[in-house]
């Protein structure tokens, strides 16, 4: 059965992560999210307080990114950023893994990094960004297995700032690895309705995109950055 606009909107994290995002742009992001009933807005942690105020009593969550976009910070710093973002009003956290540690064969350190943020989140859902464009398929599977074992809420393809974005093949691989329990978030390059529906068909249950309005109104979102 085809997804309704309302159902499709509830898969979307309406996203603005540009370093120069202004208060006015964050307010407009929130206005659009409330109008179209998106699941959340996804913003940098410094913008969480403003977004939380704008979205109070709308039912739209605020999602904050942590260790973004490189994932190369200390685990304690990532955990602290998650803690203060949640205190400021974030209802979900998207963290970036330590990609360098993974490439160096330090899988235990990667898992410990994820676990530190997961513990800091408590009951707040955590999405773990793999940055799939930088990983081999074996590395993608390894991180997805870690996330499954730790019981995080979602695995996520990309930051949208690195090499490449979400691909159907990566979404399908991630879904096969984590099974039906974890969510899979496709982010980076999902800019129109056809791409969104294809990602969902491949196994995505959440979409990170700055083209949410174009997707639910079936317009061209190619001018969007994320």
From Swiss-Prot:
The keyword Heme does not apply. It is an enzyme of class 4 (lyase). It catalyses: 2-deoxy-D-ribose 5-phosphate = D-glyceraldehyde 3-phosphate + acetaldehyde. Its EC number is 4.1.2.4. GO terms for biological process: 2-deoxyribose 1-phosphate catabolic process; carbohydrate catabolic process; deoxyribonucleotide catabolic process. SMART domains: DeoC. Pathway: Carbohydrate degradation; 2-deoxy-D-ribose 1-phosphate degradation; D-glyceraldehyde 3-phosphate and acetaldehyde from 2-deoxy-alpha-D-ribose 1-phosphate: step 2/2. GO terms for molecular function: deoxyribose-phosphate aldolase activity. The active site is at 94 (proton donor/acceptor), 156 (schiff-base intermediate with acetaldehyde), 185 (proton donor/acceptor). The keyword Nucleotide-binding does not apply. GO terms for cellular component: cytoplasm. PANTHER family: DEOXYRIBOSE-PHOSPHATE ALDOLASE (PTHR10889:SF1). Belongs to the DeoC/FbaB aldolase family. DeoC type 1 subfamily. Catalyzes a reversible aldol reaction between acetaldehyde and D-glyceraldehyde 3-phosphate to generate 2-deoxy-D-ribose 5-phosphate. This is Deoxyribose-phosphate aldolase. The gene is deoC.
């Amino acid at each position: 059965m085809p997804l309704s606009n309302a159902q499709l909107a509830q898969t979307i994290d309406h996203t603005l992560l540009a370093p120069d995002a202004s208060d006015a742009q964050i307010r407009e992001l929130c206005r659009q999210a409330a109008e179209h009933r998106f699941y959340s807005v996804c913003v940098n942690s410094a913008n969480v307080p403003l977004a939380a105020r704008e979205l109070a009593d709308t039912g739209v969550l605020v999602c904050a990114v942590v260790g973004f976009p490189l994932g190369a910070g200390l685990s304690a710093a990532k955990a602290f950023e998650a803690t203060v973002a949640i205190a400021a009003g974030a209802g979900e956290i998207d963290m970036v893994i330590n990609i360098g540690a993974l490439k160096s064969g330090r899988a235990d350190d990667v898992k410990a990094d994820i676990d530190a943020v997961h513990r800091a989140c408590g009951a707040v859902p955590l999405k773990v960004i793999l940055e799939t464009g930088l990983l081999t398929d074996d590395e993608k599977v390894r991180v997805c297995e870690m996330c499954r074992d730790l019981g995080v809420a979602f695995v996520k393809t990309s930051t949208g700032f690195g090499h490449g974005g979400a691909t159907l093949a990566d979404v399908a691989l991630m879904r096969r690895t984590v099974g039906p329990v974890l969510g899979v978030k496709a982010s980076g390059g999902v800019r129109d309705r056809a791409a969104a529906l294809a990602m969902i068909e491949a196994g995505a249950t959440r979409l990170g995109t700055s083209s949410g309005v174009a997707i639910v109104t079936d317009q061209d979102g190619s001018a969007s950055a994320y």
